[in-house]
């Protein structure tokens, strides 16, 4: 089969579109002939060696295609549960940026007729992550305010869509005025340029933020704690700008804040997110499409933070 593999850690130049052995399904696994996959920041981190993985390695967590043994159209849940620990397909195992993948049978679900392969490949990891943060952890309610940093990335657009589907109000940020304008068209209640505008002032004018979706870390942490209202919740699933901001512990007791750490999700989180997508309550925003053979260009686009939504890889059947 053809696959995208890395033989060493590094930049997009280490990605190789090459022949690789067909995977063999172990007991409890099934083979999926992939028709589409998508790109996540996880793929960039694995490519760079965080976490370090045995080489060669096929990247990719998300995918949709045809189950080889039954011919059924399926979507893959990328989460691998190990008790309280959840890992991801393509992190410590070969992933979906290939023509074939072997995955646990319990991770394969029938693909709703309303969804095409590209949409199905675009939603799982980011929507499952967002669902766990907003619904399972923070228990977001209709009418509450959600602060979403960096609208444009997959998790940000997924949290926006789930918040909107639940009847919450959204304050989104970006360093790109063009992305903010698109977010307004999608239905964002407030959209602020975090490089030139005052996010905290906008939050206070709205009455304070009930739930902060924190994925950035050092660059936004202080403003997140200033923007959240007393009794509010901060959900953390990443720290793309660095993991060691000043803690500002006094804000936690004075405001009686609750902080939730979250990563990926359970089978139940996946199914909850899937229901929102297939019912049409939450939209899946696809930024761009690249043939599997052009995955390097897809990585370069994500590295430049040019995307607004998910980057999809198309795989000929």
Question: What spans do the regions from the language model cover?
Answer:
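C-terminal hydrophobic helical "lid"/dimerization subdomain
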Residues: 1, 267-317
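N-terminal Rossmann NAD(P)H-binding glycine-rich loop of SDR-like oxidoreductase domains
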Residues: 152, 160
